[in-house]
Amino acid sequence: MEIYDFIYKIDSFCNYSNNWNIIQDSYTNEKYGYFADKRPIEVLIKNSIINADKPPGPTSHEVAYWIKQMFKVSKAGHGGTLDPKVTGVLPIGLENATKLMSYISSSGKEYVCLMQVHCDFNIDELKQIISKFIGIIYQKPPVRSSVKRRTRKKKIYDIEILDTDKRFILLRISSDPGTYMRKLCHDIGVILGCGAHMRELRRIRSGIFTEKNLVTLQEISEALYMWKNCKDESDLRKILLPMEYATCGMPKILIDDNAVDAISYGAMLTAPGIVAYQRFRVKDTVAILTLKGELVAIGEADVDSQKLVDMKKGIVVKPKRVLMPRDIYPRSWKKHG
């Protein structure tokens, strides 16, 4: 089926692999909704994510606002704040896709950081000091911070020295979201004994979004011009990622057309509505999709997927975030009250 090819593209986006288990044969009625990778451009815009390359200068909110104005949409949100001087990966969700930004914001980050130390140093000693910061660290946000200044526990997954030039060190750092790179550089300098500070910072990954398909504001502007003035939407389609790509790494469940509308109203997903699924465990975050690949909701698994084979009824997933607008698919349930 075409749907599995589309989901394979999504999962390949972050090298995720999870086999499918088919419970029942079903088909989707093309009268309702759209195949997620073939939405009309106007519909795609309202259900897409742009992997923007934030320039130095503006705030993350300003970049999101500019893109909102460019597309003339009612909402745009970003997936993780970058300071004005910081550049790099800034996923922007448009309209319906803004509901997914919290999942991106709470995912791991990766940076390239230029640190300057305040004295000559021995590279082996520096490597030893840096290695001590891999793992759990404790940070207090800087004085000029938008959050409450309390000590926070963060995890540094890896720090790699990419290059050195006199007192300048280029680092690649993988960490929890909300880790302060400026503070990390300062603390490394304290242990070194002579001080250090961050000179430049670029984010190269936010969750599953990397530099691989970054687009600049200029490229967005040019693609919009070609669509509006030359009726050529090809460049715009390369820029607009269907919001379903944000589910890469999540186990997925495909549901029957008759179950879609109830879920869009916030109903629990029960066993009879499931057509196919990837393996998941209790409490896992699961993506619920139509047979056209449209994201209906993201929820929490109430059972282990191994139980699905024998389940004839009962709750499987409790939706936490509904993305499918109501009444797109036909109603096959009775509304009470």
UniProtKB/Swiss-Prot annotation:
EC category: isomerase
EC nos: 5.4.99.25
Stored InterPro entries: Dyskerin-like, PsdUridine_synth_cat_dom_sf, PsdUridine_synth_N, PUA, PUA-like_sf, PUA_sf, tRNA_PsdUridine_synth_B_fam, TruB_arch
Listed Gene3D superfamilies: Pseudouridine synthase, PUA domain
Catalyses which reaction(s): uridine(55) in tRNA = pseudouridine(55) in tRNA
Gene Ontology MF, one: RNA binding
Keyword Isomerase belongs to the record: yes
Active site (catalytic residues): 83
Organism domain of life: Archaea
Key word Zinc present: no
BP terms from Gene Ontology: box H/ACA sno(s)RNA 3'-end processing; mRNA pseudouridine synthesis; rRNA pseudouridine synthesis; snRNA pseudouridine synthesis; tRNA pseudouridine synthesis
Domain PUA as annotated: residue spans: 250-324
SMART domains in the record: DKCLD (SM01136), PUA (SM00359)
HAMAP family per the UniProt record, alphabetical: TruB_arch (MF_01081)
Function: Could be responsible for synthesis of pseudouridine from uracil-55 in the psi GC loop of transfer RNAs.
Family: Belongs to the pseudouridine synthase TruB family. Type 2 subfamily.
Entry protein name: Probable tRNA pseudouridine synthase B
Lineage: Archaea, Thermoproteota, Thermoprotei, Sulfolobales, Sulfolobaceae
Gene that encodes the chain: truB
